[in-house]
Amino acid sequence: MFRGCAIARAFEPQTTIQEVTIASEKNERIFIQDQEDDSGSLRFSPSIGGITAETTEPRSFSFRQNNLSCSDGNILQSVENDKKDTEGRPSEVRTSTQNIATSSRSVNSNLQCNTSTPSPCNSEGIGRRSGSFKYYDRGNLVQQPGIESDYLATYLTSLSVADEKDVTIELVNIIRIIDGTDSCFLLFDRMYFESLRISEERRLERKEAFSIFTMLCAVAARIVKLSIGFSNRSIVIRDDVIIFTISLLNEGGVLECVCRFSTVPDYEESFKAFTFIVNVFRCIDYRMGCLYVGSNPMYAEQNEEPDMTVSAKLNRHLLDGYCSRPHPYAGDIGDEGEAGKPEPK
């Protein structure tokens, strides 16, 4: 189930930042801690093939991280940071809310991976966001040009909230893909929600893994955050109807999709509802004025419309320089959690 899609492009060193905010009514601030810190704090536990974050607090969440090397999985990990504490550990990993753009690299010396300086597509604004939970990938992907491989993928597998406080999740997975013209594109993988519990009184639980979306987005090089909000403002459960909001944020504009659908227990219907969100994003058509707002064609063909309404909005300048050329990749939404290999249009 936890699979990514393959691309035949040159991967260069990147700053991959995972940021999650757990916001309560008291606006608490929780910072991820180094493994060697005091008991009871959040623990950062990197490992080959998996990165996890654990806490003893009532709110619990877990991640699964696929770490990839040049080809054979022999990952040598290192962390670079401008500021280090007295023991040589990156101090900003534990304390900074200003700049979390830590440079991390995974290098297989036998393959002489490309370790050139990252291109300007992620030099401005990336990671300079404050939050309550910060997660660093200590095994950043470095690839030789021309090597085909799965991309770095992150999965949020579960979220549990023990009280009725608002909860907001902000998950960031920034992956730079250089296509030879120094254009930068962001690739987002599927995210699986095995269960989501809002409160004991009003809760939404799914034992099946929700395949939320697969999105290949080349809207703008400086989009820095994918926000999936779960709060009284962004996800509403009322009369068994969910309003779900996904936003792409950059420094100058917002691309937002709002999906409304019934909380039917049927997995297939829920999957269609979330797939609909994907299609809205993908319907940002460069040949149709760069913006599309409407219903999923697959439902129109069946002459039936689910209980959902969708709106999308964006700042026009987000697409400057992109509307005049076709989308470089067109990876289809796959079944069973696999997006398939992107192909040029």
Curated annotation (Swiss-Prot):
Name of the protein in question: Non-structural protein Pns10
Region (Disordered): 79-125
Biased composition (Polar residues): 93-122
Ranges annotated as biased composition (Basic and acidic residues): 80-92
Gene that this polypeptide is encoded by: S9
Organism classification: Viruses, Riboviria, Orthornavirae, Duplornaviricota, Resentoviricetes
Species annotation: Wound tumor virus (WTV)
